[in-house]
């Protein structure tokens, strides 16, 4: 059986189409409203100031339930992600607006979690992006594993139980 260039090209095209059609079957599902985070143990906040902001007695490992606020806005980022870099100023502005509102200030805490980022990387992120709220290293991607979702940035509002109340998902600019 002699294969022609035309049949080889057609076979390659069909193989590519099958690959692209199969990819969504293996894709991770974005976090959904109502989903509850598993038992995530976060690394210690960068500074004692960040720990104090979250209501922790000191900079130590913690869970969502340890945060002294009924609601937490969590951003999952990576310091090399251009979309995360683009999103950072908007989150900083939102944080400042919440801090100026006496009704919200103590009811909503902000937390950025650096997926696959160590302490040095998130320190640089906090300085370069001028992040005024708590930044947490997550070198083992524990939040992404709890969500079963690794892309970033993801921004979500959770309650004390870890239930997702609102999810922006992935923001593409």
What is each model feature region?
Residues 55-85, 91:
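Short active-site neighborhood of thiol/selenol oxidoreductases, capturing the structured segment around
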